[in-house]
Amino acid sequence: QQHFPWDVILCVDQSASMSSSIMYAAVCASILASLPAVNVSLVVFDTQVVDLSHLADDPVEVLMTVQLGGGTDIAGAMQYCESLVKNPKRTVISLISDFEEGGSLNRLLDCTQRLNSQQVKLLGLAALDNEAQPVYDSAIAQKLADRGMQVAALTPEHFAQWLAEVMQ
């Protein structure tokens, strides 16, 4: 039986409140990029979406490229990630955010519902502050969970474990 690779799309909020999460996501992307059975896409966003997939294996370059600040259009970023999905049942989209949507909440929820109906694995990773305490909009996180996104606030070690479980 042939095993097809997994596509993992890291969708990372780069608004001003997300600095510690950006470092964490850059390191996660580089680790995932080194795995043989994983294709990594790295997408960062504020009100604009920037695809840094070509840098996914180089966390230092990612950190030098991102520009923290600006608003937050999670819906636009998720719609971009949706356009990257080639094999829904072998795709994980991990949204790393504080879930404070500055764009259209309805667009975000509709996109999440569509992806879930295609059996894309959806992980919402809540932002952590410098003391590893969760800092996020729990009401929006709950609405995403209601539409099929698994949402958690985890340290990088626990995120790796969670991702491994989802990809089994």
Regions found by a protein language model. Name each.
Residues 1-9, 16-168:
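Acidic, glycine-rich A-domain
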